[in-house]
Amino acid sequence: MEILQFIGYGNMAQAILEGSHEILSKRFILEITGRNPEKIAPFLQEKNIQAQIVPYKDAIDIHQKFVFLLFKPYNLKDFNYQGQAKSVLSALAGVNFEALSNAINSLHYLKCMPNIASKFALSSTAVCEKSVAPSISEKALNIIESFGNCVRVGNEEQVDSSVATNGSALAFLSLVASSLKDAGIREGLNAKDSLELVKMSFKGFAKLLEKERPEMIIEQICTPKGATIEGLSVLEKKGVRGAFIKACHESVKKMRL
């Protein structure tokens, strides 16, 4: 059985492991390594994830393995890598293929931008590949699809761009959810009921968005001189649409520094 090696053990690594371990453990031997990989042991035990913890010494043995990089981008050169990987899957924001290939020898490279919804196998993940070897590529893409859906974009810069749509976006949507919950409280709902209504609204909206464009959803809800269009006019006057676009742009720009 082939080996899938996770380098890193932070929030994203844990989310991916939680959402995909049942599928991945049938296809791969799972390994986790990093500076202090034993830190993830309580999490593995709690979630009943079968993975081997490999302490880091002088170098990480990557030979003939699928290697998933899930640490901070600036730590790429802090590790020594020994051997040639079959595939390097990188979730390192702002790190291009050239930097990856200079640091790690591999037959295949895949750059991706997953999000924290990986823990429910609901990540929306933009991917781009280099040095495509069909059999290796298929297995690498299957790894990505084990924790959500996979959107193949045209170039590696577009993977970085997807921070706006599926990376930082969940934090921005959380701010929206929190604001709607507080709005409900202001209008007289208790906190529990308000949050429950917001959660179901998000669930319903996600279903609507599968079939319809955002503009069409707005059109179906708004009536002439109605309550919703009145509220939307306030949001437009306050520049909420532009603020979201600017926030996403600044997140992408910060990542590319």
Swiss-Prot record:
Catalysed reactions, semicolon-separated: L-proline + NADP(+) = (S)-1-pyrroline-5-carboxylate + NADPH + 2 H(+); L-proline + NAD(+) = (S)-1-pyrroline-5-carboxylate + NADH + 2 H(+)
Listed GO MF terms: pyrroline-5-carboxylate reductase activity
GO CC annotations on file: cytoplasm
One GO BP: L-proline biosynthetic process
EC number: 1.5.1.2
Pathway(s) it belongs to: Amino-acid biosynthesis; L-proline biosynthesis; L-proline from L-glutamate 5-semialdehyde: step 1/1
Keyword Cytoplasm appears in the UniProt entry: yes
InterPro entries on file: 6-PGluconate_DH-like_C_sf, NAD(P)-bd_dom_sf, P5C_Rdtase_cat_N, P5CR-like_CS, P5CR_dimer, Pyrroline-COOH_reductase
Keyword list, A-Z: Amino-acid biosynthesis, Cytoplasm, NADP, Oxidoreductase, Proline biosynthesis
Principal location: cytoplasm
Localization, UniProt: Cytoplasm
EC top class, as a word: oxidoreductase
A Pfam family assignment: F420_oxidored
Keyword NADP: yes
Domain of life: Bacteria
Protein family according to the UniProt entry: Belongs to the pyrroline-5-carboxylate reductase family.
Stated role: Catalyzes the reduction of 1-pyrroline-5-carboxylate (PCA) to L-proline.
Protein name as annotated: Pyrroline-5-carboxylate reductase
Organism listed in the record: Helicobacter pylori (strain J99 / ATCC 700824)
Biological classification of the source: Bacteria, Pseudomonadati, Campylobacterota, Epsilonproteobacteria, Campylobacterales
